[in-house]
UniProtKB/Swiss-Prot annotation:
Pfam families: Abhydrolase_1 (PF00561)
Top EC class, one word: transferase
GO biological process, one term: methionine biosynthetic process
Catalytic residues (UniProt): S157 (nucleophile), D323, H356
Name this polypeptide is given: Homoserine O-succinyltransferase
Annotated InterPro entries: AB_hydrolase_1, AB_hydrolase_fold, HAT_MetX-like
Keyword Cytoplasm: yes
Gene3D superfamilies, sorted: 1.10.1740.110, alpha/beta hydrolase (3.40.50.1820)
Species of provenance: Pseudomonas putida (strain GB-1)
Amino acid sequence: MSTVFPVDSVGLVVPQTARFDEPLALACGRSLASYELVYETYGTLNASASNAVLICHALSGHHHAAGYHAATDRKPGWWDSCIGPGKPIDTNRFFVVSLNNLGGCNGSTGPSSVNPATGKPYGADFPVLTVEDWVHSQVRLGERLGIQQWAAVVGGSLGGMQALQWTISYPERVRHCVDIASAPKLSAQNIAFNEVARQAILTDPEFHGGSFQDQGVIPKRGLMLARMVGHITYLSDDSMGEKFGRELKSDKLNYDFHSVEFQVESYLRYQGEEFSGRFDANTYLLMTKALDYFDPAAAQGGDLAATLAHVTADYCIMSFTTDWRFSPARSREIVDALMAARKNVCYLEIDSPYGHDAFLIPTPRYMQGFSNYMNRIAI
């Protein structure tokens, strides 16, 4: 590996594409006749295929979880702090697979892909997806790679929901579930945040009912506002106060409604601008709906313990003290249900000032707890 990369990096990685021509039936009643999933792998699959770990991404995530696509990249993959030699998901031990989910906008088939039936981008005609749909598609990817059972399925936030769903839908295919900063279903407040974000996009004049690509435009304003709202919920009050306080961009107030006066305003606008230039509006709508619809215990009348009665995986559940988007109380709901179902579970509640985004930040106790659990997994 080139010396330009840190010694604990997986180094240069090349995305790969898997095409599936067998129709995929979806929860909404529709199906996809064919689709593609973009993914990356890190480490080496052992002879018995017993060391495979699946990484499931959150709302705005993608397949590029670790390493670099070029020596000139300024930043590595989004979870590089946790994936690599000697890191919690140690690529000296594990073969790691990270994908861009169906409906995404980073290469996998999604709303911005060409609909073979029309020759135009799917746009708003792309079917609504659920977490369970994603898991079904991920099963096929695993089989394509020769993996019948995952040593672990790992994810944070929406990724944690996928990890939990894996153990319910395919209990025989998962030995360990690492579910971080997640919840067994969304609260009314979380659904409300998602609806505000969707309305920002849907009411943008440039959205054109989801057919904005046909018009050669992007609903930039709506995406920007959606990201600004979402980003506030990913941070804690303390971390925002420490980072920005009431600091001004200049040394005076302008007494108008158009200037960017506070540092926190500047930060949110930057985050919104950056996001609106790289993310697809229809994908954002799909991802938030998948979050809203996630409720694996619904079929059991809301009884999560009964839903988990048949699972066989061991679980590691982690939460962060200042995460108010998916608070520790939501993780403890999962832990309590697993204990009621007499399943093996360990729980780590980590003191962190970083809010929901803490699952992306390599604080010492988080890294130690994560490593300790992963190192216990027999391969």
